[in-house]
Amino acid sequence: MAPLLKLNILLLIVLICFTFHANATHRCVRHGEYCNERIRLDCCFGDCVKNKCSDDF
């Protein structure tokens, strides 16, 4: 039972690390804010037009 518990803890740690790494490298910005796909600043909604987020609802 102990080896299975260690494996579960290891998998949980790996999952947490990947989750925080993904959030740290990718950011969502709102309407009118600066966006740039090269540095991973994407618009939450709409498209990045001339480095500004434009909402398309």
UniProtKB/Swiss-Prot annotation:
Molecular functions per Gene Ontology: toxin activity
Keyword Transcription on entry: no
Signal sequence interval, chain numbering: 1-24
Disulfide feature: 28-44, 35-48, 43-53
Keywords assigned by UniProt, alphabetized: Disulfide bond, Knottin, Neurotoxin, Secreted, Signal, Toxin
Nucleus recorded as keyword: no
Origin: domain of life: Eukaryota
Compartmental location: Secreted
Main location (coarse class): secreted
Family: Belongs to the asilidin-1 family.
Record note on domains: The presence of a 'disulfide through disulfide knot' structurally defines this protein as a knottin.
Role this protein plays: May act as a neurotoxin.
Protein name, per record: U-Asilidin(1)-Mar2a
Species the sequence originates in: Machimus arthriticus
